[in-house]
């Protein structure tokens, strides 16, 4: 029941919490909007399209593996970007978050929403985030939202955050999602968004 209810809550015909979460991520961006953005785990392209519309001088890349379990695809993302009039600035690539086919120090902003916990290519989540930071320019900004407090996936939360601070980053902030926005009780379940945390900072 919890999973079917959460699917309803995230759907456009429901209360659209996915859009609310994406709005929160966009609001947390502290950047002039001139440069390149990477969205890791772009899904349907919803977040990257919102970023493209918010920052009209940016150029954006969305990567996803688009596995069989998801109804999204690269073609659908491109179509969605075209509908919103941003397809000339947005590019989509099929790739794994564990091995980004991108150059070092290439992006001014890197974002990811509820992707890292899904990546099966590696169990080392620190290495996964290290790979995301690799493609970020020095001084560039990152905003990651995921189930970072789920210790079965990310290990002890305090130890996880301490290990992140040892990466090539100059600043790290962490916020519990439930303290940043109001969520219905069922979405606060640990299996849904109860373990969700936002990590933001600079390289």
Residue ranges of model-derived segments:
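Conserved class I S-adenosyl-L-methionine
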Residues: 33-43, 61
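Conserved SAM-binding strand-loop segment of SAM-dependent methyltransferases
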Residues: 85-97
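A short acidic, Gly/Pro-enriched loop at the edge of an enzyme's catalytic core
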Residues: 98-110
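A short glycine-rich, Lys/Arg-flanked "PGG" loop and its adjoining helix->strand segment in the class I
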Residues: 126-138
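Core SAM-dependent methyltransferase catalytic element
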Residues: 181-203
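Conserved SAM-binding loop of SAM-dependent methyltransferases across substrates and taxa
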Residues: 44-56
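Conserved beta-strand signature within the Rossmann-like core of class I S-adenosyl-L-methionine
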Residues: 139-146
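Class I SAM-dependent methyltransferase Rossmann-like catalytic core
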Residues: 2-24
């Amino acid at each position: 029941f919890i999973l079917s209810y959460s699917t309803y809550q995230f759907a456009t015909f429901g209360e659209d919490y996915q859009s609310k979460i994406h709005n929160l991520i966009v609001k947390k961006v502290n950047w002039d909007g001139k440069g390149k953005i990477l969205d890791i785990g772009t899904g349907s392209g919803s977040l990257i399209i919102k970023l493209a519309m918010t920052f009209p001088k940016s150029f954006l890349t969305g990567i996803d593996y688009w596995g069989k379990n998801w109804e999204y695809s690269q073609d659908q993302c491109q179509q969605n970007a075209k509908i919103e009039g941003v397809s000339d600035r947005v590019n989509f690539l099929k790739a794994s978050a564990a091995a980004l086919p991108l150059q070092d120090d290439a992006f001014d902003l890197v974002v990811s929403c509820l992707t890292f916990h899904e990546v099966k290519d590696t169990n080392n989540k620190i290495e996964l985030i290290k790979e995301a930071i690799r493609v970020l320019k020095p001084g560039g900004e990152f905003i990651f939202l995921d189930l970072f407090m789920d210790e079965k996936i990310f290990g002890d939360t305090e130890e996880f955050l301490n290990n992140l601070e040892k990466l090539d980053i100059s600043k790290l902030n962490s916020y519990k999602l439930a303290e940043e926005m109001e969520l219905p009780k069922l979405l606060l379940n640990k299996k849904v968004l109860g373990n969700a945390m936002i990590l933001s900072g600079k390289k």
